[in-house]
């Protein structure tokens, strides 16, 4: 049985329409900063709690800094405290490789000190520390530090770099690259879900651990991402702005999750470009500029 909780802040109820009437699915509409939702959650019998609730990304956190801290840290720790008292099997926190920030180390692993350059990164650092403190009190936890997300989904996000570049290339718009040398690891949304399932399937191995979730082969500079898209869509025009540089740059090792949980990703940036192309051709995305597809 699955219980889903969401505030539906982005008018995204349609993304669960296909499962809302399933007998083994229950939906709770609410914000994790609201005590009413906590009361509802506390009534449920829970084996595994997966905390995906967050104000995600640097721009979104910049627009709502107080809300970002409240959701990403305060409410997250409050939820974990509730789960500590419910004696669950596993609490999974969705974190981010953004905690590494601007880092000169060639390949970062889970032991590398975080150097976030944004509120989003800092809020996740604080959340991780809070979860680890509760772990010392008995909370069984796993933390997944996700690479940068991409991929077509029930509610595709076109404010994510790969998705945005794919959409722009497919609609004959320039790909604007700021600097372009900054490196990011990338992960498809389906592989993000897969990482969660691997933690649940291997609770004894996953418990008390932090995992970078992604694939070393998917560490790319932003310019490389643009060039991958141009390989698929040759008409793509890449515009580089050298005077605007993004300081966030890091390559990440994913050896731990591969070795400990036998986890490997299945999808690549090319899959996302092809999926977005197919969605546009099949008119599944009627208005790519709609606010439905953006968090900022």
Q: Where in this protein do the model-derived segments appear?
A:
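Short aromatic-enriched loop/helix-cap "lid" or pocket-rim segments at secondary-structure transitions
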Residues: 14-17, 104-106, 154-157, 189-190, ...
